[in-house]
Regions:
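Class I S-adenosyl-L-methionine
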Residues: 6-160
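N-terminal Rossmann-like NAD(P) cofactor-binding module of classical short-chain dehydrogenase/reductase
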Residues: 1
């Protein structure tokens, strides 16, 4: 599995791309290369792989994703009384929020079955709490949803 930094790739940060391009003309190409390294290693060793990134320019710099998901689609893998262990004041119980995320995968990676939970219509209201540049905010925005992580583990583990 690979989780390349989305800072230079995610379209949610497009307002900052021009400023970043002035500092480093190749910043997005270099960011996309980190994904390609993970892909090349998986290909070299013939192992299943999964690369996760939000909706981003990676789709045009490399290739289209193999799948997409929203966290709430896998919230059913978490207990009914679930609260996030570190950020329960921000992340909804059972990952009950939308955030389209892209997955590039191959070499036998098994896509997990969805187990959706109810979610409010529209945009995630936790986005209101996740603006800014603090380290905590950046960490929270970059976390892989726990329900999806568990679903991937169960789908791809031969020991379960």
């Amino acid at each position: 599995m690979a989780f390349p930094p989305c800072t230079d790739l995610a379209v949610s940060g497009a307002a900052h791309f021009e400023r970043k391009r002035l500092a480093n003309q190749n910043f997005q190409i270099e960011a996309a290369e980190t994904c390609k390294v993970a892909f090349k290693l998986a290909e070299k060793y013939g192992v299943p792989y999964m690369i996760e990134n939000p909706v981003s320019v990676l789709s045009s710099l490399w290739r289209k994703p193999d799948n997409t998901f929203h966290p709430y689609e896998y919230g059913g893998y978490l207990p009914e009384d679930d609260l996030h262990p570190f950020f329960s004041d921000i992340i909804k119980p059972r990952d009950a929020y939308p955030k389209k995320t892209c997955i590039w995968s191959g070499n036998g990676f098994k896509w997990p079955h969805a187990s959706p939970v109810d979610v409010n219509d529209g945009y995630s209201d936790q986005n209101k709490k996740l603006g800014g540049k603090s380290k905590k905010t950046k960490v929270i925005r970059s976390l892989t949803p726990r329900g999806f992580a568990r679903a991937v583990f169960l789908a791809n583990s031969t020991n379960c």
